[in-house]
């Protein structure tokens, strides 16, 4: 049976969701390089957080706001702008249209925006799977470990970059 599981993973249609890899969050080179290794292997989408106080009260409530015009730092196939923690409905619809059986998720703010993306994908009937060594956390836990623990608790599916590349 283990061989059948391994074989089914190899044949699984996958897509990559890159969350908030943008200048204001200062992604390290290792994160950009790791994501770059996945971009050539599967369809990809990215989210970018931009500020619109009329939609999301970052400044009023948190005393911080993302930039008005930040850009994506990776060459994803499609980039979707969001104004809060969750990915947009259009992004989720696009992933559905790709008919991905599993959505690999990586990026910045593992304990907030990445986790929120996991909830949105899960609720949409997709299979969110975190690439656990391709995340950074928020200012609360820059290591990303808190986000990985929360993801494991809520969704169970965490893989490493090496595991994805080995498939």
Explain the meaning of each model-derived region.
Residues 17-19:
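Short hydrophobic beta-strand that contains or immediately precedes a catalytic carboxylate
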Residues 2-15, 24, 41-43, 57-167:
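Active-site-adjacent betaalpha module
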Residues 21-30:
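Short acidic, Gly/Ser-rich segments with clustered Asp/Glu that frequently serve as metal-coordination loops
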Residues 45-49:
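Short beta-strand segments at enzyme active-site cores
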Residues 51-53:
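Transmembrane alpha-helix/helix-exit interface in multi-pass inner-membrane proteins
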